[in-house]
Amino acid sequence: MPIQSRRMFLTNAALAGATGLTGFGVWGKALAAEPPPEITTIRFEKDTATCIAPQVFQELLRAEGFTDIRYVDFTEAHTRRADAANSGPIADMIAHGEVDFAREFAPNLMLTMNAGGPVTVLSGLHLGCFELFGKNEIRSLGDLKGRTVGTDAISDQALLTIMTRLVGLDPAKDFRWVTDPSLRPMDLFIEGKIDAFLAAPPDLQEVRARNIGHVIVSSITDRPWSEHYCCMLATHSEFAGKYPVATKRVLRAILKAADLCASEPKRVARLLVEQGYTKRYDYTLQALSEIRYDVWRDYDPEDTLRCYAMRLHEAGLIRSSPNELIADHTDWRFLDELKRELKA
């Protein structure tokens, strides 16, 4: 994590002030009436995905009483370990106690739950952000039959499996997988080694800018994917049970940050660039402008988990009962409280 410069601090602080969580705003008074967090050090994952935007608002987290905010790099080794366990890569970091909170793709969370990982989902963060790209002659999911599909993690195969099963394909025999965490699927596509691949921000914006292939399915616009959360916020189950005040305070800061992503995308994009999370302001702004961060008050996160869990179960990718997994690995108390407190 780069050292925070004065300019970065001022940008972060200005955005924090815009939320009303600092100073003597209404939320500042609410914070003062609550007990302090049981722990003041918290850890998040750090990766290149624009989806992490709500996690980087250090001043919002500091306003909640956290004095030591750490970011742990997500690496290729994390992906390989998760692949071996049939778990979601970032959720696997939570399960191993390497981070306290992280955003993770909903199907990956279900895989980690099924693998026995001690993760607890707290909230949805935003709706769809990924798109499936393919060669020009591939016009639909059904056209993937007999093709080669690239992913950088085995967990991505789970998503494509449930998507293609809806159109009658059996991914185990109808197309060939190429999965390598050390390679970018986009590069393999350019080299002609694969016929289709998934892209998420910021790679998604680069694919568009370079006019590489075309969109087969977009979770941003195409149902049912556009109607469900893409990334969700999760914590270690032990953390949520041991530190309920800290858990609520972290969630509040991140949901306020999500509001800022929706209302101030230009300022948030600038912050991400200044803090070294991404290099391209234009790609980041495009992603923040498209991704729906404004839905956490209205969309039910449990609906998303149940939708993906049922499809994963039908595909034989998870063994446990979807209802049991959701009952054991979710805690909506904090979200319900914050929906009442942070009315739009």
PLM features: residue spans?
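N-terminal export signals
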Residues: 2, 8-29
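A general structural motif at alpha-helix termini
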Residues: 13, 17, 126, 148, ...
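Short, solvent-exposed loop/beta-turn-alpha elements that line the ligand-binding surface or hinge
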Residues: 62-66, 221-226, 292-301
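Solvent-exposed, polar/charged alpha-helical surfaces in well-ordered, non-transmembrane soluble domains
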Residues: 92, 142, 158-162, 187, ...
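Pocket-lining segment of extracytoplasmic ligand-binding domains
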Residues: 107, 184-274
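Conserved C-terminal helix/tail region of periplasmic/extracytoplasmic solute-binding proteins
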Residues: 313-344
